[in-house]
UniProtKB/Swiss-Prot annotation:
Keywords: Acyltransferase, Cell shape, Cell wall biogenesis/degradation, Cytoplasm, Magnesium, Metal-binding, Multifunctional enzyme, Nucleotidyltransferase, Peptidoglycan synthesis, Repeat, Transferase
Residues noted as binding UDP-N-acetyl-alpha-D-glucosamine in the record, renumbered to the chain: 8-11, 22, 73, 78-79, 99-101, 136, 151, 166, 224, 330, 348, 363, 374
Gene Ontology CC annotation, any one: membrane
Cofactor: Mg(2+)
Region (Pyrophosphorylase): 1-226
UniProt-annotated binding residues for acetyl-CoA: A377, N383, Y384, S402, A420, R437
Catalytic reactions on record: alpha-D-glucosamine 1-phosphate + acetyl-CoA = N-acetyl-alpha-D-glucosamine 1-phosphate + CoA + H(+); N-acetyl-alpha-D-glucosamine 1-phosphate + UTP + H(+) = UDP-N-acetyl-alpha-D-glucosamine + diphosphate
Protein name: Bifunctional protein GlmU
Annotated organism of origin: Pseudomonas paraeruginosa (strain DSM 24068 / PA7) (Pseudomonas aeruginosa (strain PA7))
Region (Linker): 227-247
């Protein structure tokens, strides 16, 4: 059956106390609406319609994509009214309705929900709660068939004792939806057009109302304030941590890991506390990551070691290489096999060949180093003249003395050496020793200045 999806994302989110539309607040570094859209895409619908209202322009700008149709709800008159705004664009046999502030919904749950939809049967997602206060109750008859959904403010005392609640997520036969929405009334305590009223209409029309429940109740937890946002964040991170551990990762404290993207891991990986993984991160077998590291869009090859307090972005570490502590590898940084970058070393668009080392206190930008090079402490590649960037190229087995300034564009040949304290401005041929510093002078009988007495 053909499928279209409507995502309701028009709410203001006043309890968030924020200028940012609620659905753009993040879970794991991604807007809540982004999580819902990603899940919806896995169902391969013909189209996804996003109903927007408060902050509509910003939501459209942030989430724009070719497969999304944004529909404006100028006035927020209830969920039924919101879905009605998408009606002119709907033609599929099935329509699935989701919510932009329910970010943890899972594909398996939605597939089970949709499997129950036929031309004469709709399906809604429910969950049992110990404290259902504030939620719409699922009213069933003596045989257990769903009869209606009653919102909390409209419920009788007896109905408020019901623990099964409406999540708002439902799937309906597309040909029936327009008729039901056209019959909605706002004669209720909220003065709104409730989408949930279509359940009673469906029953009255002789349709069967099926139901499904998520395996994890947190899947359908919505976000109305920052506390709920934090709860979902921690729940999401716990799930990701458990997933990594099942794949062979040792987490020294699963509660102190943040995953904010797509992570691929090998076996026998060890991750210390307070590590943040962002974007697309590939971690191969036997990698070790120390505490307080941030790793974004990077590849860590087999046996690589990241020591404490290091920051990697757009970097690749070869087999058996290591970085840190306090190393910063910016986009385009590549360490060859067994290469080493030590404390307070920054790389940017720089490649270190196999076995090369930059032990400490150096900046290497727009540089290409061959194999088995040694970079002395305090070395800087001077790659920018105020207008353009230039490259520094070192051959194999180059030894750079401490406190060197390598002024690009510059080439240093295989086996060359530069003396400590040098400013190197011209090409150094292979196996040459280059000095680029003032000759030392010693002044005899030097007397230190004395303080002036007043």
């Amino acid at each position: 059956m053909s499928l279209e999806i409507v995502i309701l994302a028009a709410g203001q989110g006043t309890r968030m106390r924020s200028a940012l539309p609620k659905v753009l607040h993040p879970i794991a570094g991604k807007p809540m609406l982004g999580h819902v859209i990603d899940c919806a895409r896995q169902l391969q619908p013909e189209r996804i319609h996003v109903v927007i209202g408060h902050g509509a322009d910003l939501v459209r700008e942030r989430m724009a994509a070719d497969d999304l149709n944004f529909v404006l709800q100028a006035e927020q008159l209830g969920t039924g009214h919101a879905v009605a705004q998408a009606l002119p664009f709907l033609s599929a046999e099935q329509v699935l309705i989701l919510y932009g502030d329910v970010p943890l919904i899972q594909l398996d749950t939605l597939q089970r929900l949709l499997a129950q939809v036929t031309p004469d049967q709709l399906s809604l997602l429910t969950v049992d709660m110990l404290d259902p206060t504030g939620y719409g109750r699922i009213v069933r008859d003596d045989q257990g068939a769903v009869q209606a959904i009653v919102e909390h403010k409209d419920a009788t005392p007896a109905q408020r004792q019901i623990g099964e609640i409406n999540t708002g997520i439902l799937a309906v036969p597309g040909k029936r939806l327009a008729d039901w929405l056209g019959r909605l009334s706002n004669d209720n305590a909220q003065g709104e057009y409730y989408l949930t009223d279509v359940i009673a209409m469906a029953v009255g029309d002789g349709l069967v109302v099926a139901s499904a429940q998520p395996l994890d109740a947190m899947e359908v937890q919505g976000v109305n304030d920052r506390m709920q946002q934090a709860q979902l964040e921690r729940h999401y991170q716990r799930l990701r941590a458990e997933e990594l551990m099942r794949q062979g990762v040792t987490l020294l404290d699963p509660q102190r890991l943040d995953v904010r993207g797509e992570v691929s891991v090998g076996r026998d990986v060890l991750i210390d506390v307070n590590v943040v993984l962002e974007g697309r991160v590939v971690i191969e077998d036997d990698v070790r990551i120390g505490p307080n590291c941030v790793i974004r869009d990077s590849v860590l090859r087999r046996g690589a070691v990241i020591k404490a307090n290091s920051h990697l972005e757009g970097a690749e570490l070869g087999e058996g290489s290591d970085a840190g502590p306090f190393a910063r590898l910016r986009p385009g940084s590549v360490l060859g096999a067994r290469a080493h970058v030590g404390n307070f070393v920054e790389l940017k668009n720089a490649r270190l060949g196999e076995g090369s080392k930059a032990g400490h206190l150096s900046y290497l930008g727009d540089a290409e180093l061959g194999a088995n090079c040694n970079i002395g402490a305090g070395t800087i590649t001077c790659n920018y003249d105020g207008a353009n960037k230039f490259r520094t190229e070192l051959g194999d087995d180059v030894f750079i003395g401490s406190n060197n300034s390598l002024v690009a564009p510059l080439k240093i040949g295989d086996g060359a050496t530069t003396a400590a304290g040098s400013t190197i401005t011209h090409e150094v041929p292979a196996k040459n020793l280059a000095f680029g510093r003032a000759r030392q002078k010693n002044l005899e009988n030097w007397k230190r200045p004395e303080k002036i007495r007043k």
